[in-house]
Amino acid sequence: MLTFIELLIGVVVIVGVARYIIKGYSATGVLFVGGLLLLIISAIMGHKVLPSSQASTGYSATDIVEYVKILLMSRGGDLGMMIMMLCGFAAYMTHIGANDMVVKLASKPLQYINSPYLLMIAAYFVACLMSLAVSSATGLGVLLMATLFPVMVNVGISRGAAAAICASPAAIILAPTSGDVVLAAQASEMSLIDFAFKTTLPISIAAIIGMAIAHFFWQRYLDKKEHISHEMLDVSEITTTAPAFYAILPFTPIIGVLIFDGKWGPQLHIITILVICMLIASILEFIRSFNTQKVFSGLEVAYRGMADAFANVVMLLVAAGVFAQGLSTIGFIQSLISIATSFGSASIILMLVLVILTMLAAVTTGSGNAPFYAFVEMIPKLAHSSGINPAYLTIPMLQASNLGRTLSPVSGVVVAVAGMAKISPFEVVKRTSVPVLVGLVIVIVATELMVPGTAAAVTGK
């Protein structure tokens, strides 16, 4: 009975939050209210409000406010600062004319590509490769928004389509050393090499190709439906005085991430890399003009871009975090787990149930890690009691948690991309919905075809 009540409360609040965001209310305000309401109800029901890693203040009422403080410090300090730095960097690149120079140079070969959607797909594949270097979905999203997004928009790709490309690369896991993959390999009782490269990677590649094709047709359909015209920017309209080599500057963060990954050079944080990139750009500006006042005034543009990012993106991330914690403390995730364990032992049925519940949990909470970490703990027990190959259950769940995050209007990556693109999170979700669902279907079918369903098939008995 309690499980039903917790699910009902979660669903009612989720529907209410979605309704008011769709009606045009501030997403930050609506998510804050929804999250605080869930935390208050959790406290009344006797649930612990703060995560287990945090010490209570002694009172549930102050614990609620304490959690908001924790999020402000964590998301405003690390992730938030990274987002603000990326937004400030993007603003500075526009100010000094580097983005204009990229478009000016790129427009020449792009004249031979009749469809901007082909360029969009090429950008998607590049973005997917970037996920190997940047493991954070939100971090990858904001990095792509600061680098690829302006280029895509300026060469004729709609803002919605370009935002979808930046939001969706982390939906399918490629990185073999990410925490999710390591945990999934353990739950599957396989070595990391066998699990990541021999089993998961072929499925991931198939899903990425399918999602790329889906992006091509779905973004084109939505653009036609919404009467969005695609006109290549007239190069003659670009009046930038920046030298041609400035075209490399917007991509220096990506180059820095690849170089300073601990293999080719020292391992540096993305914020450190961005500081280096800003210093390089400002020094080049000084060499061009020998005008210190002009350089300092230009940097003020970057600072204002950082301030706008705090108001439009970081605070939205904090509100989304409060909402996700409210769903967690109310028992919403645990209730979904209880439902999963009540189903029978048929491998395909159990796999589909786990995929759907993991996807639902990821969509509602906005987290890819939390639902997977919660569900994956019961995989070995479920698999052994049912005679099912653990990997058969783990791989679709692993991908479903990340795919579901891309469909969540409260997930960090969707919120950050929407905020930087200045469009609604629901617009991003709409743009990613069909490609994500296509990817999910491919993952399920590929798992059924490529991964043995029974433990006996794996052991050869």
Curated annotation (Swiss-Prot):
Belongs to the DcuC/DcuD transporter (TC 2.A.61) family. Responsible for the transport of C4-dicarboxylates during anaerobic growth. Catalyzes the uptake of fumarate coupled to the export of succinate. InterPro entries: C4_dicarb_anaerob_car, C4_dicarb_anaerob_car-like. It catalyses: fumarate(in) + succinate(out) = fumarate(out) + succinate(in). It is found in: Cell inner membrane. It comes from the Bacteria. It is a multi-pass membrane protein. Signal peptide: none annotated. GO terms for molecular function: antiporter activity; C4-dicarboxylate transmembrane transporter activity. This is Anaerobic C4-dicarboxylate transporter DcuC. Keywords: Antiport, Cell inner membrane, Cell membrane, Membrane, Transmembrane, Transmembrane helix, Transport. The chain crosses the membrane at residues 2-22, 26-46, 79-99, 116-136, 137-157, 164-184, 199-219, 240-260, 267-287, 313-333, 343-363, 436-456. One of its GO terms (cellular component) is plasma membrane. Its main location: membrane.
